[in-house]
Amino acid sequence: VQPGTYNVDIYFNQSLSKRQDISFILDSSSGKVKPIIRLALLEELGVDIQRLKKDGVIPTNANPSQIVDLMALIKGATLEFEVTRLALEISVPQIYVKRQVHGYVDPSLWDQGLTAFYTDYQANFSRNDSNGNRSDYRYLGLRSGFNIAGWRLRNESAWTGGTGSKSTFRSNRNYAEHDLSSLKSKFAIGELYSQGEIFDSVRFRGAQINSDIGMLPDNEIGYAPVVRGIAETNATVEVRQNGYVIYSTSVPPGAFEIADIYPSGSSGDLTIKIIEADGLVREYSQAYSYLPVMTRQGNFRYSLAAGEYAYDGQPSPRFIQGTVVYGLSNNLTTYGGGLTAQDYKAANVGFGVNSGIGGFSFDVTNSQSKGLQGNTDEGQSARFLYSKTFNATDTSFTMSGYRYSTAGYRTFSQHIDDLTYFNEQSSGRQKSRLDMNINQSLGQRGSMYASLGESSYWNRQGRTRNWQFGYSGTLAYASYSLAIAHTEGSGGPNSDTQFTASLSIPLGRSDRSHRLYANALASQHGDSSVQSGVSGFLNEGSTLSYSVQTGHSKQSGNSSGIGLGWDTPTSRINGNYNQSRDNKHMDLSAGGSVVVHQDGITFGQPLGETFALIEVPDVSGAGVDSSASIRTDRKGYAVVPYVQPYRYNWINLDTTTLGNNTEVSESSAMLVPTRGAIVKARYASVQGRRVQFDLKQDSGQPIPFGAQARDSQGKVLGIVDNLSRLLVFGIHDQGVLELNWSSGSCKAEYHLTPVKRDRAYERFELRCRTSSAQ
């Protein structure tokens, strides 16, 4: 390498740590070019500088900008530079390495990604025919975006329609955002949702800046909920947040679990609506974010939002909201915030504690609001949140909490309701709410879960309540589950309790085995049903699935149905048809994506918030290890969805899908995208024929072991092995081989027959005209 400054990848103890400019200078004493290494860089990489000072390796007053000779400084340390990869390899004995925080990635590696446009779609259609009464349901969800210069321009829209309702297309929101890596934050402008950690999240038009916890290490990041329920028939499950449909899917009878919901905002309860095939609708709510407010010592999280309230048909007062969370110690967090608008003010103060009995937080919010009639209401709301995993019993309490509000308390949304409705909807305001979620592992005997949600309201009799309990386990190769769910309105007629049991038995030992299953369901309304069937995959790659079932219901009589699912490289398609004595049900769904980038248009499967575009130039059908259904198109491009922002993502090519006539120099690529980025991985490939020549000299003697083979342009093709064979890749269909060894040389003309693609390599015998060594 020549002296100068190079932008290099720095590997610390074999792990990619950061990317930055490093200066290389000529060492006059050794005559070699060496990198300039300073103490500050070693500390950034994770070297324990304090330990070096304690052991007398460096002076206690050493300056961070001091240049050091690493290998002379630390015994056992190594320093190597690989110029072909621009990679600087630094190795330091573990005794002088600080304990690394799991999940931390240096910001210098964060990739803003490509300039590109995409749209991600999910289309659902269902039809129910009950005693000749036909009803349809249609849904199309779109998430579109354009990335340029680190900006993320986004639109979320949904089109819904059905029998008896007008088809509507609604744009949930349009916004633009950009990360602020130096602040571990992001800035957004447009139609947004305010942060809901302290105050309830609201939809607004304006601007917002807030901490992005995705930039933090793993141990400081929370999690989102799993939606569970029980469907009595082939039902449609619709999930809404802040009044907008954010998820819709079809589920078969029995217990269901949805874990891949993509929320619109940072908070706001989820409303789950189960639309049964016979028209029965059940609805309940579930907390989206219900973790104690805590952070580590010295950590600071914040949010600041300004704009105008934005819900259809309601007033749009301007407001400003700010919140802060600060870790006083590893066991004590303080937080608070304020919200001010015309005729409304709210202030919050609270604390979080990490203790031996779990993590909990407690806060109080005070509100003052003026209604349409000029009256001023003031009230308080107290909230307690709790989370704990008991290692001894492997019991987890997650998203558990209790809130109590006085009669005069108003959230910002409730204040807007008071301005919208003259009678001020006092009977609809929540008085208290209890949420509890427990997960219990039973080891080899399975696992259990239980959840409870209960709310009471001012000036309204009764309570709304929903609770669920489930158990799942395995017996030999079979798996089974039991579940019970209850929903109850505040004095309404829609209360119901359901019980379901299921059993699944594999008809083989492989992962692709067909499975025999049975499901029984009973409800408080007196209906009961039994269903059994078989399901599995129809192809080697497990991308084409099927299910066939038959059953009997007390209400609907005998039933039967069939389902098909197909994961293609460009979409996910599902279809189901079920028929009983009085009902016919059909549902179809398709999801996929379109990405427009500088090299063309690439179709793919449904995307996550952040995704990757891979390129294997001019190689179609190349796959990745993480998914059997992802394949490159005819240009060599494919979309890999759901990559993690601010984390290492290794995307490995499935080399068995490349074919015999393609080679890649590297089959793995490491990506670290920023949130919302479209990052690219390019795998350099070479295409050509793979041929083995069985060589002999004119005399019939073998070619000596180690002879070097070149083509007519002098390019080295390979070395002859000890059996006089030469394996080469990427040669022309005809040409001349030149072989040289210590005592002679020879030339051989070859003419290859048409390629045989079913073979790992082709084999030809070849005579070489020998000439004596000069």
Predicted regions and their residues:
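Short, ordered, surface-exposed loop/turn motifs in non-cytosolic proteins
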Residues: 3-11, 15-24, 618-627, 699-713
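Short, acidic Ser/Thr/Gly-rich low-complexity loop/linker segments typical of extracellular
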Residues: 22-23, 628-637, 714-725
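Residues that define the transmembrane beta-barrel architecture of outer-membrane proteins
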Residues: 115, 134-140, 168-172, 223, ...
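Transmembrane beta-strand segments that form the barrel wall of outer-membrane beta-barrel proteins
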Residues: 113-131, 148-163, 187-191, 301-310, ...
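A short, amphipathic beta-strand motif
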Residues: 10, 229, 612-617, 689-698
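Outer-membrane beta-barrel translocator/channel fold
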Residues: 166, 191-203, 363-432, 482-502, ...
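Post-signal-peptide, soluble extracytosolic/periplasmic N-terminal scaffold domains
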Residues: 1-221, 524-595
